[in-house]
């Protein structure tokens, strides 16, 4: 019966492998099945720790609330309660907006919510449920240095992070009498950038793994 659900599964191959492993385990056979482990909103967890944000920490399991929290569902439900069922947003879409916005993205939230009332409800909700973590987003934008070729920092284990600032140069070239635009990435200062938040968070993630 379970195998009949494979076409409906979000990840059909993983679902199929899991069912096979389940059947073999029930027969007492060694399965050697590699399980998948994932953190609970690891980006939000790290931001909560960096900022000492108790509200955000309770949202994603950093502070034990007595049961397993699902930050994405909590934020989604907060939005639905605020704007009503007419919002026509899904948890999965909301999750995409939350994940990317915590790394500085504004494009994905706009794709999900548009640029009107729904987007503002999203911003207000994030500010309410994870105030310090959300504010750190703006800090990462504000500390962008428009004069440097790289951003550098040192982690507690003396790992030196060096991230080049990359921009693009567009040039027109002729090839067989046809004009083409060639885009080249170069190491050059940029007036604005959104990568600091993601890079700092990921560097701390790597530090914890080491």
Where do the language-model regions lie?
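Conserved catalytic core of nucleotide polymerization and phosphodiester-bond processing enzymes
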Residues: 1-210
